[in-house]
């Protein structure tokens, strides 16, 4: 069939003009196309045989309608990346750099702008006489960060910037001592990003920075930089790898002297930094940040000396625990960030330490005490220029309520028999007879044995089976059906209470739980109990690799996973982990250092937590665990001072100290409550409530005291108290200081305790309380009298 021709082909008329362009003919065959192309080229050639290309096709609008369509089609170019946000200079066009007026990277007049530096105000006459290329500009925090910073975080960023830039004095270092959960990491990310991008001179202040942290937190720092900066900056995280690869990578980082590096921030652990310090100390670094900086309290260790050799004047030290009780440690931390502030070690002793310690002696004169007070005030006033500390009272504005409970659990009959037999043994008697270094070491081992026995007899079964000193005749104490590899909660008061509470939580709520212990052997028992009750769980201890830790934490925090328990070794993961997937935490055994326990217990009440939190500290009634708790309380009450010269509560024991530790207080509800000599309680029953301005950060004497399960803020604990019959006493309080709570009900004032019959009951809190901020200066802390 013959193909019909188009009208233009039938007419044979084509317009040939240099000013007009006609659409090509429909393709017939290759020969016809070549002929047509030659015709077009010949029509465009001039006398010099130069081709004049036609103008590009343009849309011609002949009516209002056509103009409207043209506006729609002529839309502005859009970057084809989802949720793309330009970092800076988004309105700039390509081309030759134009001479423009120097201006800040971000608008200082914008809403919610955080201005860290304001240049001097010049008159128009002064501005004309100055060199335009040297005019200073505002330093403004990137809006992507300033819009998410809370008021206390904005204050912290401003404080650190002024310190590292020397605006607050003749120094360039600072200590960020905020308590856990206040966002120290976000504040440091903001400071680092600002210094890498801005300065009053319209150029970066620094080109590189190093963040040194425990190995378990290196990955967390990388996630925080990515999270808050939305991937605008790449960090170099040193996680494992061979020695050759690590050396090559660090050498490339050290030798990179460009103003803008591809990876300007190095994330490295303390151990790796110490091993490769000879590489990193070759060149200058803009700033170093030391996370968990209390590791640097000893100026004689190799890590401290390696970091001191780093060529940088800007040093930031982060520590969520207060600087406590030792002037030498105090000097080491301050001297690291600002080496010249307190002089040399001998200068510090001569000017401050000797006078302060002399005034603390029991036989000191009034003049020596007065001079000690003067020197203390002088020292605090000097170092406060570079130290900022805020308590987690601030979090009460942003986080759900937190309930803290110290639960005294009675020893079982088996535990009590083993405990008393060991105290009466020749092993303990010899330890108390003399206080030489050798016997002190033996006493420390005996203390550890008693602490493990308070957890569960399984932890000392090997000593019992081997008939070691102190357990020669203890084999008969264990029940006939005893199996060491099959955990029996009924042999331990604390384990029995834990078993009942976990069952109640699992049956009546969707809460997740964190279990923390100082001993991996206790974690083994947790695992056996979880398998016995068919609870899903994850475990993190020192044997887990750094990469796997991050995956385990992410899995547990995922609401979609049915992971009920997170078992944590306080030595391996007590610092820096964010476990907001859980809202209940059990601290199964106390540590000598209260800072270690506080770090571990701060894993759940953090930014991102959506549910009320319950913190349980379990101690065995009348045992050595209560003695440790009392020493913790005494040490915490001294935390506002820097005067106590005790290095470690576990290393300097007098004979009287040891006798007190090895004394078992039988038939008491709580030895700690007895030593408080509480005037609000009569015969262990509370008659008066605590002060209205108290909260869970106050001294234990200002907490609620309960000798029965009535008046407890947690119905889970109340039910477990009745079911297990092993709880003797409870101290409890909440995070909001002015919250109205019921006093513990006496026998004469009965009220029915609500039973656990729904998931809503399990999280019973007063959600409508209008809590105000707590004033930390209004608390009147008291010392324990022991």
Swiss-Prot record:
UniProt motif (DEGH box) ranges: 291-294
GO MF term list: ATP binding; ATP hydrolysis activity; ATP-dependent chromatin remodeler activity; DNA binding; DNA translocase activity; helicase activity
GO biological process, one term: DNA synthesis involved in double-strand break repair via homologous recombination
Highest taxon above the source species: Eukaryota
Broad EC category: hydrolase
GO cellular component: nucleus
Positions carrying Phosphothreonine: 22
CDD domains attached to this UniProt entry: SF2_C_SNF (cd18793)
Quaternary data: Interacts (via N-terminus) with spn-A/Rad51.
Function: Involved in mitotic DNA repair and meiotic recombination. Functions in the recombinational DNA repair pathway. Essential for interhomolog gene conversion (GC), but may have a less important role in intersister GC than spn-A/Rad51. In the presence of DNA, spn-A/Rad51 enhances the ATPase activity of okr/Rad54.
Name this protein carries in UniProt: DNA repair and recombination protein RAD54-like
Organism from which the protein derives: Drosophila virilis
């Amino acid at each position: 069939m013959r193909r019909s021709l188009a009208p233009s082909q039938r007419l044979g008329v084509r317009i040939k003009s240099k000013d007009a362009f006609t659409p090509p003919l429909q393709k017939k065959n290759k020969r016809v196309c070549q002929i047509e192309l030659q015709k077009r080229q010949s029509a465009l050639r001039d006398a010099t045989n130069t081709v004049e290309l036609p103008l590009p096709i343009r849309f011609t609008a002949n009516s209002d309608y056509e103009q409207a369509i043209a506006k729609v089609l002529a839309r502005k170019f859009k970057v084809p990346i989802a949720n793309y946000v330009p970092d800076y200079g988004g309105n700039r066009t390509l081309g030759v750099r134009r001479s423009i007026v120097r201006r800040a990277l971000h608008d200082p007049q914008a809403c919610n702008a955080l201005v860290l530096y304001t240049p001097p105000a010049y008159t128009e006459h002064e501005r004309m006489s100055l060199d335009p290329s040297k005019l200073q500009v505002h330093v403004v925090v990137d809006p992507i960060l300033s819009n998410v910073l809370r008021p206390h975080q904005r204050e912290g960023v401003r404080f650190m910037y002024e310190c590292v830039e020397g605006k607050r004095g003749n120094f360039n270092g600072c200590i960020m001592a905020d308590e856990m959960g206040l966002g120290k990491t976000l504040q440091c990310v903001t400071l680092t990003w600002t210094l890498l991008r801005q300065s009053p001179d319209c150029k970066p202040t620094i080109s590189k920075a190093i963040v040194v942290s425990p190995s378990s937190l290196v990955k967390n720092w990388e996630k925080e930089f990515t999270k808050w900066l939305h991937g605008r900056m790449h960090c170099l995280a040193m996680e494992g790898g061979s020695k050759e690869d690590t050396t090559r990578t660090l050498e490339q980082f050290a030798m990179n002297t460009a103003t803008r590096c591809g990876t300007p921030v190095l994330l490295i652990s303390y151990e790796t930094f110490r091993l490769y310090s000879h590489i990193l100390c070759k060149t200058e670094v803009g700033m170093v940040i030391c996370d968990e900086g209390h590791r640097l309290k000893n100026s004689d260790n190799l890590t401290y000396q390696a970091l001191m050799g780093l060529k940088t004047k800007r040093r930031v030290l982060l520590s969520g625990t207060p600087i406590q009780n030792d002037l030498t440690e105090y000097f080491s931390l301050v001297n690291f960030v600002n080496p010249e502030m307190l002089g040399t070690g001998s200068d510090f002793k001569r000017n401050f330490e000797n006078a302060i310690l002399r005034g603390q002696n029991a036989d000191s004169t009034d003049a020596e005490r007065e001079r000690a007070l003067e020197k203390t005030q002088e020292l605090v006033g000097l170092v406060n220029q570079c130290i900022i500390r805020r308590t987690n009272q601030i979090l009460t504005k942003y986080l759900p309520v937190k309930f803290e409970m110290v639960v005294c659990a009675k020893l079982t009959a088996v535990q009590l028999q083993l405990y008393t037999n060991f105290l009466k043994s020749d092993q303990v008697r010899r330890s108390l007879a003399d206080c030489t270094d050798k016997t002190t070491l033996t006493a420390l081992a005996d203390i550890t044995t008693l602490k493990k026995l308070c957890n569960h007899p399984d932890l000392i079964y090997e000593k019992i089976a081997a008939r070691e000193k102190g357990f020669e005749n203890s084999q008969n104490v264990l029940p006939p059906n005893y199996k060491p590899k099959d955990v029996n909660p009924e042999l331990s008061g604390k384990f029995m209470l834990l078993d009942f509470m976990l069952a109640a939580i699992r049956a009546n709520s969707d809460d997740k739980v964190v279990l923390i212990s100082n001993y991996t052997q206790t974690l083994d028992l947790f695992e056996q109990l979880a398998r016995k009750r068919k609870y899903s769980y994850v475990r993190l201890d020192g044997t887990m690799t750094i990469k796997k830790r991050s995956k385990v934490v992410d899995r547990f925090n995922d609401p979609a996973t049915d992971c009920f328990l997170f078992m944590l070794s306080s030595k391996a993961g007590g610092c820096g982990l964010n476990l907001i997937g859980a809202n209940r935490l059990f601290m199964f055994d106390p540590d000598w250092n209260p800072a270690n326990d506080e770090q571990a217990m701060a894993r759940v009440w953090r930014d991102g937590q959506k549910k009320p939190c319950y913190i349980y500290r379990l101690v065995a009634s009348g045992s050595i665990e209560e003695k440790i708790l009392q020493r913790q309380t005494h040490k915490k009450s001294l935390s506002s001072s820097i005067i106590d010269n005790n290095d470690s509560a576990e290393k300097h024991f007098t004979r009287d100290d040891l006798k007190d530790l090895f004394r078992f207080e039988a038939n008491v509800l709580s030895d700690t409550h007895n030593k408080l000599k509480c005037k609000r309680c009569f015969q262990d029953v509370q008659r008066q409530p605590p002060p209205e301005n108290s909260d869970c950060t106050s001294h234990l004497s200002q907490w609620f005291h309960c000798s029965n399960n009535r008046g407890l803020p947690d119905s889970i604990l109340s039910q477990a108290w009745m079911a297990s019959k092993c709880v003797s006493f409870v101290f409890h309080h909440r995070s909001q200081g002015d919250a109205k709570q019921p006093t513990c009900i006496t026998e004469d004032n009965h009220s029915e305790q609500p039973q656990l019959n729904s998931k809503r009951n399990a999280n019973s809190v007063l959600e409508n309380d209008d809590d105000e901020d707590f004033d930390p200066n209004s608390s009147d802390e008291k010392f324990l009298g022991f």
